[in-house]
Amino acid sequence: MADNRRRRSLFDFLLFSVFLGLACLCLSPIPATAQRRKLRFSVNGEFKILQVADMHFANGAKTQCQNVLPSQRAHCSDLNTTIFMSRVIAAEKPDLIVFTGDNIFGFDVKDALKSINAAFAPAIASKIPWVAILGNHDQESTFTRQQVMNHIVKLPNTLSQVNPPEAAHYIDGFGNYNLQIHGAADSKLQNKSVLNLYFLDSGDYSSVPYMEGYDWIKTSQQFWFDRTSKRLKREYNAKPNPQEGIAPGLAYFHIPLPEFLSFDSKNATKGVRQEGTSAASTNSGFFTTLIARGDVKSVFVGHDHVNDFCGELKGLNLCYGGGFGYHAYGKAGWERRARVVVVDLNKKRKGKWGAVKSIKTWKRLDDKHLSVIDSQVLWNNSANKLVVR
């Protein structure tokens, strides 16, 4: 009984926090341009990213949980998702929060605007920069995909973009953009991007006749990615403090590439595969585009909630985030989870921070202790070729 009272108190506190945050949002809207900030590595030479995949948020306390234990059903709702997010943000203190689609479950949503605001409320309250891309369910309420992104980019503390201005006239989808992570303050690379993040809209469902299934990353998006990657390489190699090679990158989108089908329980490096991969219905060649450019070291997706593995194919890590939300389907007794990525810088001989040294990841479970599992190194610049001159 005491546990239930504590749980209800926490629910009430979070409901008040969400209400207060939304009230402030309505009374004091912050223009998106005013929120833009330069992201950079910390004085400790680290940049941490929290991935939240498949919240499937609907109507708050009135929304029932899916696939939980019988003992959890009576007191389980969207608020469990809210509580989990607040806990993991407090525990990890990330530098950036990334929502990789199906943020709301449109079919069950009564008020799209209210559900979107509530879904992101813990991130907004944390005042940590955050970004979002769309999945295949975000637009299934009263908002179109464009309307969803148009609203998201106006929320406080977000760095999300509808599309890059230079590509808005030709690019497919809504939510394609790049963020640059600059070197540590007071280092020679403080004004140079040493880590590049790519966010892409993988769409929802195929609109091509006789090609039913999930959507895919289009040629126009790949063209934008290729141009952006090449431009960032030129900037990385340029004076002042020119660097060799290309800065490493990470890519985030919702629907898995067909190449995720290459893995099973035997060759996935960490994590589990508990369901089939619901990949894009056609192979548009984006994996090949990523390999050809060479900067992206890891891809992170959602969509298949009870898969949370990473697998390496041709030097590129393909990783699931694992299902986060309680209104999303899951597996009873298999905890909801979030993926954390930490990128570390190389320390130079004089004690200053240099370019990226390694990329690591682990997952946090929504259990009593927020257990950490499946720690692994995704990429290590062992050759130390990215040197500060």
Curated annotation (Swiss-Prot):
Fe cation binds at residue 305. Keywords: Glycoprotein, Iron, Metal-binding, Secreted, Signal, Zinc. Residues 1-34 form the signal peptide. Homodimer. Substrate binds at residues 136, 303-305. It is found in: Secreted. Its main location: secreted. This is Probable inactive purple acid phosphatase 29. Expressed in roots, stems, leaves, flowers and siliques. Glycans are attached at residues 80, 191, 267, 380. InterPro entries: Calcineurin-like_PHP_ApaH, Metallo-depent_PP-like, PAP14/16/28/29. GO terms for cellular component: extracellular region. Its cofactor is Fe cation; Zn(2+). Binds 1 Fe cation per subunit. Binds 1 zinc ion per subunit. Pfam families: Metallophos. GO terms for molecular function: acid phosphatase activity; metal ion binding. SUPFAM superfamilies: Metallo-dependent phosphatases. Belongs to the metallophosphoesterase superfamily. Purple acid phosphatase family. Zn(2+) binds at residues 136, 303. Disulfide bonds: none annotated.
